[in-house]
């Protein structure tokens, strides 16, 4: 392998599960299928539903373990849990944290590890309401990250200030964040002129309601739960939060007039290199 510049983390990249060697001359089919080097060959793909594979007769590392493999897309966490319990599927990835105890026994092989996955709330600075610094501060102070970790992630994580874990040399306390302080958030909003004048629980300012459109997606099991938690906690301080949890989030996100906050989850340093 020849790189255009020194790349000391090359071996890390090659070991990344998302790292692939693809035959670019073969190209990509209309269905999105590529020619790679893995133990299985994709025979059909229905995006968002099902991927069918058959063993690669020319695999470089011995006989693949199965003749055929079917990969199903199951976005709903409860449905995924029941499918594995009933034997409808043989294995699962991305199980909801709340379901972990059901499979941590001798009947299943269960594997999990800490990663650099972080949950983000991206604020849209092209949105008029997000341009108000008081609104941004109130959102940051009004989301109870500790409770989200404890209750919805079942303790599998910790509240983060930055995008990288504490054990990274470029992470930890390099960034500070607002503490959860709903009363302080209320004070900031009131001082900025956001007041509930009609008693409906939603603040207003100059005829505009304190409404934010929260865009997210359902394929990461915890994101819809985060949206509901935020809707509740920000609702307590006078926000109206309108949730749009959709698989079509990417096409919506390119339109800056269609959302105010975009929530996502991603592994920030899968190879140890930011």
PLM regions and their residue ranges:
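Ligand-binding "clamshell"
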Residues: 101-112, 256-259, 272-274
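Short, hydrophobic alpha-helical packing/hinge segments within bilobed ligand-binding/sensory domains
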Residues: 79-81, 89, 99-100, 126, ...
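Short, well-ordered beta-strand elements
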Residues: 1, 38-43, 51-52, 67-73, ...
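Ligand-site clamp/hinge motif
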Residues: 28, 56-102, 231, 240-242
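Periplasmic-binding protein-like
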Residues: 109-124
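Gly/Pro-rich hinge or "lid" segments in bacterial periplasmic/extracellular proteins
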Residues: 5-64, 68, 78, 182-183, ...
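Periplasmic binding protein-like
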Residues: 235-274
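Append "and occasionally in soluble cytosolic enzymes with long acidic Gly/Pro-rich linkers
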Residues: 131-232
